[in-house]
Amino acid sequence: MGNFIAEIAIIKPLHNLFDYEIPNTFKYVTPGSRVTVEFGKKLVTGFVINIKKETKLSNTKLKKIIEIIDDTPVLDEEILNLFKWVSNYYHAPLGQVIGLGTPSYLRNGKEIFDANYNTKNFKEDELENTFNLTKEQLI
């Protein structure tokens, strides 16, 4: 098998990680990346935990990653290690630990936006005239 395999944590109460083939068109899949995969008959968001070269599954059973959601991993190595430790210590499914430890927009596969993008920089004189408060309102 020429392609690499990603071990994916799905945010469900399951103790297993699931193997998915990384298509050749996806260049930057690393641990901590969010991906969209087919799980059963649904498309779900998963988190890449590990990259490996081999799997015990046959080629016919191995599904491919459908989409990489972010350009860079959303979970760094330190956070991933913390989630793994919590999962091991409390005997909790890794996918659920990640689900509890991340904001809902990450779990739901939504794009991350930059809060500073496309904001207007105000000049001081513009800010001074923004509010015309009375003396009673200032107290």
Predicted region positions:
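Accessory, non-ATPase domains that flank or precede helicase/AAA+ motor cores in DNA-metabolism machines
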Residues: 1-139
